[in-house]
């Protein structure tokens, strides 16, 4: 009976009153949607297109082995993938083919022949990027507007002067106040990016002589990425609980292991090294050198003398 009475009450409501009621409710809902703060979407960074390595700058035997001769350029991600999937065992250790065909230093070969494959010091898939990077070599020259320019670390001034003489770049006299400023065309930027794997830092196609000099200095600098590093003192291994191997008078550990061990001493909230770590390394790292992980790695290690094997 009660349900029937409710129905009678509902039926007695006029169409005008019902319309007013729903209109008010809808307006409230719209107001709530408008005033509600929507969570801001993170700005998605445009992914930079991956640089293609010219085929002639990749180790010829590697190119031939995987049939890459006709490629217009080889993505470094493809090289990484081919290295990881063809030169490592199922448990992620470098196999015998990799030891023969990839670019290893004499020291690395000696260490691999000394330690057991099960050792955490053995080269594994965490070292793929280093091994893949060694398969590409730096360009020694580039061509532009019918001219050939040679890249030599101790002759960068001559290179810049030659570019100016050939009018491949032009002096911008209006902008040249504290430093000589040059107009560098897009076509030359593309050539440099393709052959040297990075672009010079320009603004509106203008670059200073200092920046251009620094650019050529960086691209002609030899890549010295190491898998193994020499510790300055055996006590460092004890402080950081590192696995090591002794070769002659030197104590080696893996660069990645040392980096990870130091990174673990960084406080996740303050982003600074733990005080106890400061105390432990005080003898080896000066206070003004505790800038970041890579700087501390430099302070705890001896520069390696790299002699590459299997290079072409």
Curated annotation (Swiss-Prot):
Organism per entry: Vaccinia virus (strain Western Reserve)
Coiled-coil region(s): none
Keywords: DNA-binding, Virion
Induction notes from the record: Expressed in the intermediate phase of the viral replicative cycle.
Function: DNA-binding protein which binds to the hairpin form of the viral telomeric sequence. Required for the production of mature virions (MV).
Annotated GO MF terms: DNA binding
Extra remark beyond the main annotation: Each virion contains approximately 670 molecules of OPG077/I1.
Pfam families, sorted: Pox_I1
Family: Belongs to the orthopoxvirus OPG077 family.
Protein's UniProt name: Telomere-binding protein OPG077
UniProt GO cellular component terms: virion component
Gene name of this polypeptide: OPG077
UniProt-annotated location(s): Virion
Organism domain of life: Viruses
InterPro entries on file: Poxvirus_I1
Main localization of the protein described in the UniProt heading: virion
